[in-house]
């Protein structure tokens, strides 16, 4: 299982994070008003794991399977930092982050997804309540190990 290491909470805004990832396209609703980059408690290391299913799955089914593997749901910030540090991953197929969904303008609950269109890296929003097709990899977080003092 590949683990991707990122660090959240470096003080950048959502707009700065999106710009740093150098996407060819970013959904117009992914900005600080809708997805404010939270400060956490300073720099926060995270371990991202991508799960792949051989059949269409709901967000609920994917989250249940992730929990069985000891994984937790991501934050939307995980997607923003992941796209900066690992730009090539989305070129191999879409990556969806099943964070707490954002209620979009038309009443759809959305999650941030990273994908490519003819080799152009893109950041978009997809329906959290739709089925995720087998070509999607769903991002979850390995909980931090307790540190000993």
Where would I find each of the regions flagged by the language model?
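A binding-site-centric feature that preferentially detects glycan-recognition modules on secreted/surface proteins
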Residues: 1-149
């Amino acid at each position: 299982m590949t683990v991707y290491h990122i660090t959240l909470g470096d003080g950048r805004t959502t707009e700065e994070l999106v710009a740093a990832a150098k996407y060819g396209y970013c959904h117009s609703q992914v900005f600080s008003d809708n997805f404010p980059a939270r400060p956490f408690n300073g720099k926060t290391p995270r371990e991202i794991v991508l799960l792949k299913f051989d059949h269409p799955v709901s967000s609920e089914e994917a989250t249940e399977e992730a929990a069985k593997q000891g994984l937790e749901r991501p934050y939307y910030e995980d997607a923003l930092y992941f796209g900066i540090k690992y730009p090539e991953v989305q070129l191999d197929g879409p990556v969806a982050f099943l964070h707490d969904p954002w209620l979009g303008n038309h009443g759809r609950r959305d999650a941030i997804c990273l994908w490519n269109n003819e080799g152009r890296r893109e950041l978009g929003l997809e329906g959290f309540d739709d089925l995720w097709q087998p070509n999607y990899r769903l991002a979850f977080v390995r909980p931090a190990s307790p540190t000993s003092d």
